[in-house]
């Protein structure tokens, strides 16, 4: 990296760290609510419009959004990289998963490298991917889903958890168990977040983790009135997140089917084509048409059987 670029990034980190660190509690809450409405509310409504026409998912890509949230909550900026380097300037990692409008089960993926990758990195005098993960100060996890069994339209739920990666023994033990269990080209350690569940149980076949003591917040975004979105803090953001005093708790893996998939409402996955005239006035005329939600119900049932 050229010196000028390196200096610019370093200066940007310094300035943003001061700005983020000086935010009051009320300012952090205001910024988070504004972000939730902009990126989870308005963007999802816009995507639904185009999904009705194309039959594609109205899922919101939460990757970079989760990093925005983490920076506001933890007061730590990013480095301006796109997919390269640390997610936060202090070396912390951010993971996101979302199921606002879709039928597949999201996961938090951790690329810990294969055995061959480990050997290659060590031959160059570099730490392995697993060693780098276990060396980060904090792991910030974000999940965006909808509460199960809530009246239509169900609110968009945004939850975050933060782990002290140096002090959380059960979290570290599970990572190390995966690292020692690798065979061949196995590299991806997947944690299944509690999509559609009100608890904080994170699932992996090597063992589950209870995240309830590291929950940072639980916010619900209602779009019942799309012109006036409302946010309810089911679990408010604490006034202080760092240092993280809570710890995860190891649980036994319950076996396949112990926690069946809970999907979003079918009509939210694929809107009916009879809405297209109103969604695209001047281009498409209102007309009676076969409602694709009926087809979607059949597709969803098949997906539930596949992923359960």
Swiss-Prot record:
One Gene Ontology MF term: type II site-specific deoxyribonuclease activity
Catalysis: reaction(s): Endonucleolytic cleavage of DNA to give specific double-stranded fragments with terminal 5'-phosphates
Keyword Membrane: no
Highest taxon of source: Bacteria
Cited Pfam families: RE_MamI (PF09567)
InterPro entries with a match to the protein in the record: Restrct_endonuc_II_MamI (IPR019067)
EC number: 3.1.21.4
Record key words, sorted: Endonuclease, Hydrolase, Nuclease, Restriction system
UniProt-listed GO biological process terms: DNA restriction-modification system
Top-level EC class as recorded in UniProt: hydrolase
Protein name as it appears in the record: Type II restriction enzyme MamI
């Amino acid at each position: 990296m050229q010196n000028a670029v390196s200096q610019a990034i370093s200066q940007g980190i310094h300035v943003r760290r001061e700005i983020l660190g000086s935010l009051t509690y009320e300012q952090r809450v205001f910024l988070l609510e504004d972000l939730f409405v902009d990126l989870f509310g308005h963007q999802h409504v816009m995507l639904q419009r185009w999904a009705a026409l194309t039959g594609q998912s109205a899922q919101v890509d939460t990757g970079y959004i989760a990093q925005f949230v983490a920076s506001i909550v933890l007061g730590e900026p990013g480095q301006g990289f796109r997919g390269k380097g640390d997610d936060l300037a202090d070396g912390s990692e951010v993971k996101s998963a979302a199921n606002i409008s879709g039928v597949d089960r999201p996961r938090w993926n951790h690329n810990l490298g294969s055995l061959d990758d480990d050997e290659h990195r060590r031959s160059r005098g570099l730490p392995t991917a697993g060693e780098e993960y276990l060396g980060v100060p904090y792991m910030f996890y974000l999940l965006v889903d909808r509460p199960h069994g809530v009246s239509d339209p169900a609110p968009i739920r945004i939850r975050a958890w933060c782990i002290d990666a140096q002090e959380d023994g059960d979290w570290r033990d599970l990572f190390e168990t995966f690292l020692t269990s690798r065979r061949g080209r196995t590299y991806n350690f997947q944690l299944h977040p509690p999509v559609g569940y009100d608890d904080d149980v994170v699932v992996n076949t090597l063992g589950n983790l209870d995240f309830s003591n590291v929950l940072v917040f639980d916010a619900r975004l209602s779009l019942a009135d799309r012109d006036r979105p409302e946010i309810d803090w089911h679990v408010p953001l604490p006034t202080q997140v760092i240092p993280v005093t809570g710890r995860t708790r190891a649980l036994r893996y319950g076996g396949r089917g112990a926690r069946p998939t809970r999907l979003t409402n079918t009509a939210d996955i694929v809107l009916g084509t009879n809405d297209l005239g109103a969604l695209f006035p001047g281009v498409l005329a209102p007309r009676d048409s076969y409602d694709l939600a009926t087809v979607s119900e059949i597709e969803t049932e098949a997906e539930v059987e596949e992923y359960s």
